[in-house]
């Protein structure tokens, strides 16, 4: 699995992951503010939304 591992889409850093999912974490009430991207699917947090997906580079 190949996932993006950066906070903004301008820096197209990718990593190869053993996990079969990628994630994108962002602030729930502030559209467009991405906190993190990476491998796996972390647990939900208060005031954070996490989008998990199952294909290469799906967390853009």
From Swiss-Prot:
The protein, known as: Toxin S5C4
Tissue expression pattern:
Expressed by the venom gland.
Q: What is its main location?
A: secreted
Tell me where in or outside the cell this protein is found.
Answer: Secreted
Which GO terms label this protein's molecular function in UniProt? toxin activity
Recite the UniProt keywords alphabetically. Answer: Disulfide bond, Secreted, Toxin
- Record carries keyword Lipoprotein: no
Pfam families reported in the protein's UniProt record: Toxin_cobra-type
Q: List the disulfide bonds.
A: 3-22, 17-39, 41-52, 53-58
Q: Which family does it belong to?
A: Belongs to the three-finger toxin family. Short-chain subfamily. Orphan group XI sub-subfamily.
Answer yes or no on keyword Secreted. Answer: yes
Sorted alphabetically, which InterPro entries does this protein's record hold? Answer: Snake_3FTx (IPR003571), Snake_toxin-like_sf (IPR045860), Snake_toxin_con_site (IPR018354), Toxin_cobra-type (IPR054131)
Origin species: Dendroaspis jamesoni kaimosae (Eastern Jameson's mamba)
A single Gene Ontology CC term: extracellular region
